[in-house]
């Protein structure tokens, strides 16, 4: 049985295309698997990023709340320092303190009378 050069060439060409198609099919399957894995990883990373964003917002809110609390404490400390300086005045001038209290009470009483008119 004699095979012509054309037939042999055609047969080699068919075998080459068949082999190439098998190789390409395996590559496509591996790429599909890779795409699936990458998509899964991307979704997991997106979820983790969203969780981090939620945690950051919570920490930021707590940080702002702490700043406000610290500012309030500092204001109160400053007031206490000023009041502590007045302790000597109160001890040495009780009449002045009594006069200030009476003035404040009189002003309060006048305000009440004005409101009741």
Swiss-Prot record:
Transmembrane segments: 3-23
Keyword Coiled coil: yes
GO annotations of cellular component type: host cell plasma membrane; membrane
Principal location class: host cell
Periplasmic side: 24-117
Cell compartment(s), UniProt: Host cell inner membrane
Keywords: Coiled coil, Cytolysis, Host cell inner membrane, Host cell lysis by virus, Host cell membrane, Host membrane, Membrane, Signal-anchor, Transmembrane, Transmembrane helix, Viral release from host cell
Keyword Protein biosynthesis: no
Record's bilayer topology term: Single-pass type II membrane protein
Domain of life: Viruses
Stretches assigned to coiled coil: 24-93
Record topology, Cytoplasmic segments: 1-2
BP-aspect Gene Ontology terms: viral release from host cell by cytolysis
Main function: Component of the spanin complex that disrupts the host outer membrane and participates in cell lysis during virus exit. The spanin complex conducts the final step in host lysis by disrupting the outer membrane after holin and endolysin action have permeabilized the inner membrane and degraded the host peptidoglycans. Host outer membrane disruption is possibly due to local fusion between the inner and outer membrane performed by the spanin complex.
Binding partners and assembly: Interacts (via C-terminus) with the spanin outer lipoprotein subunit (via C-terminus). Part of the spanin complex which spans the entire periplasmic space. The spanin complex is composed of spanin inner membrane subunit and spanin outer membrane subunit.
Protein name, entry field: Spanin, inner membrane subunit
Protein species of origin: Enterobacteria phage T4 (Bacteriophage T4)
Gene name in the database record: y13K
């Amino acid at each position: 049985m004699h095979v012509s050069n054309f037939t042999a060439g055609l047969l080699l060409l068919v075998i080459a295309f068949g082999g190439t198609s098998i190789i390409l099919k395996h590559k496509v399957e591996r790429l599909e698997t890779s795409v699936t894995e990458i998509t899964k990883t991307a979704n997991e990373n997106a979820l983790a990023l969203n969780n981090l964003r939620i945690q950051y917002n919570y920490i930021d809110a707590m940080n702002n709340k702490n700043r406000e609390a610290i500012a309030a404490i500092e204001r109160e400390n400053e007031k206490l320092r000023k009041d502590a300086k007045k302790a000597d005045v109160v001890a040495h001038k009780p009449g002045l303190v009594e006069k200030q209290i009476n003035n404040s009470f009189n002003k309060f009483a006048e305000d009440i009378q004005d409101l009741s008119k």
